[in-house]
Amino acid sequence: MRKDLIELDGSEGGGQILRSALSLSMTSGQPLRIRNIRGRRSRPGLLRQHLTAVRAAAEICAAEVEGAELGSRELAFRPGAIRAGDYAFAIGSAGSCSLVLQTLLPALLAANGESRVRISGGTHNPLAPPADFLRDSWLPLLQRMGAEVDLELLRHGFVPAGGGELLARVRPARWRPLQLEHPGAALRRQARALLAGIPGHVGERELERVRQRLGWSDEERQLEFLAEDQGPGNALLLRIDCEHICATFCAFGQAGVSAERVAEQVATQAIGWMESGCAADEHLADQLLLPMALAGAGSFTTPRLSAHLQSNRRVIERFLPVRIGDQALDGGGHRIVITSA
């Protein structure tokens, strides 16, 4: 049966609209056309990371594609049948491996067999969730929703050099709903300063500022030296394990920004989330919406609604028979509720 074409304006939400639309087109079988891709960005059109996601999606479902080239502002994507397999995709820059993998996972979870996906590029990119976030925060929630995915970080890759690598093993699964009302009691905390080709005193200063801002003990703060050929790069990661969720926050060292400022950025993120009492921080909320919609139902609380979440909601409701509601919480925050349309 021929399915109706879904047409989208890609100017509002940047690459998020493209990635979500590709995931939904593959899983629903509905053909897609996006115009004005990243039209409001300083560098509009498809960048390497987006192009890798398009080509990878096309390979996995034998899609017919028009406009799959660097700088393209319009894309037509007509999916075929999803095929399990052993796949390898190279971004060719420090573009985010995490975002490419997130684009492909919904389809591979609906495939007819087990798949392996190896993606090379940036694993720790300031404009995307780091691999640690996927492994520690996002995937455990998807596993509670029925997904069967194992993720290995084979090699770190920072901006601008890239060279990182992820390996995912994906087995077919059925989605089930999940409700996340609050995080529950904190069980464990860990701060990690990653250094690749960067002096140790940078990480020491970052971790000292974490101690000052958050009061975390020596045992809760760790300096981690990576092989120099995986850099140069520096990331400060905070992980907070709670009864119902694991939260991950990250900030990146960069030229002209002090180690103390990097630590202030990530500590402020963590404090804001802890004080809110909500289950999902702003970035995790962005990433939970699509899998919950694929499950057909679910809910979570979050301190605020990002522009990414808002644009993602509009795309999802074009493809799937769901309603995504927003309930204001007393004292601030939002409850996002997904129901059948």
From Swiss-Prot:
Catalytic activity: a 3'-end 3'-phospho-ribonucleotide-RNA + ATP = a 3'-end 2',3'-cyclophospho-ribonucleotide-RNA + AMP + diphosphate
Cellular compartments annotated: Cytoplasm
SUPFAM superfamilies: EPT/RTPC-like, RNA 3'-terminal phosphate cyclase, RPTC, insert domain
GO cellular component: cytoplasm
Keyword Cytoplasm: yes
UniProt-listed InterPro entries: RNA3'-term_phos_cycl_insert, RNA3'_phos_cyclase_dom, RNA3'_phos_cyclase_dom_sf, RNA3'_term_phos_cyc, RNA3'_term_phos_cyc_type_1, RNA3'_term_phos_cycl-like_CS, RNA3'P_cycl/enolpyr_Trfase_a/b, RPTC_insert
MF terms (GO), sorted A to Z: ATP binding; RNA-3'-phosphate cyclase activity
Annotated ATP binding sites: Q102, H283, L284, A285, D286, Q287
Coiled-coil regions, chain positions: none
GO terms (BP aspect): RNA processing
Main location: cytoplasm
CDD domains associated with the record: RNA_Cyclase_Class_II
Family (UniProt): Belongs to the RNA 3'-terminal cyclase family. Type 1 subfamily.
PANTHER family in the record: RNA 3' TERMINAL PHOSPHATE CYCLASE, RNA 3'-TERMINAL PHOSPHATE CYCLASE
Function: Catalyzes the conversion of 3'-phosphate to a 2',3'-cyclic phosphodiester at the end of RNA. The mechanism of action of the enzyme occurs in 3 steps: (A) adenylation of the enzyme by ATP; (B) transfer of adenylate to an RNA-N3'P to produce RNA-N3'PP5'A; (C) and attack of the adjacent 2'-hydroxyl on the 3'-phosphorus in the diester linkage to produce the cyclic end product. The biological role of this enzyme is unknown but it is likely to function in some aspects of cellular RNA processing.
UniProt-recorded name of the protein: RNA 3'-terminal phosphate cyclase
Organism: Pseudomonas aeruginosa (strain ATCC 15692 / DSM 22644 / CIP 104116 / JCM 14847 / LMG 12228 / 1C / PRS 101 / PAO1)
Gene name of this polypeptide: rtcA
